[in-house]
C-alpha cells in the first residue's frame, strides 16, 4: 500500500476519534466504524496498528488518544476546519468544500499551511 494512503488512513482514524471524544466525551470502536463507514473488524485492525504506534490506548470499551495521537489529530482537524471554512467563504458548496478539505488536510506541508493562514489573516485585517 502507498505510504500516503497509510498516512491518510491513520490521520482519518485519529481525527475521527478526536471528533467523537470532543462531541460525546468518549469513543468506542463501533462508533469509529460507523462514523467512517468501515466494518468493526477492519476498524479494529487499524486501531491495533495505531495502538502499536503509540497513538491511542484501548481499554475494554473505549479508545483514547495519547499525547502523540492527540497532536496528530488536532493538526489534521485544524487544517480540515480551516480549509472547509475558507472554501465555503469563497463560494464553494459545502459538499465539495468538505471533500476538498479532507484531501488537502493530508498533503499540505506545515510550511505552506502556516503561510496560507498568515496571508489570509493579513488580508482579513486590511
Residue ranges and their predicted role:
Residues 51-60:
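A short, conserved structural fragment
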Residues 13, 32, 43-51:
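Basic amphipathic alpha-helical segments that dock to polyanions
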Residues 41, 95:
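Key DNA-contact positions within bacterial/archaeal DNA-binding proteins
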Residues 99-126:
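C-terminal regulatory/oligomerization modules of transcriptional regulators
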Residues 2-38:
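N-terminal helix-turn-helix DNA-binding core of bacterial DNA-binding proteins
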Residues 75-89, 96-103, 111:
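Short, solvent-exposed amphipathic helices
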Residues 61-79:
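Basic, amphipathic "hinge/linker" alpha-helix immediately C-terminal to the N-terminal HTH DNA-binding motif
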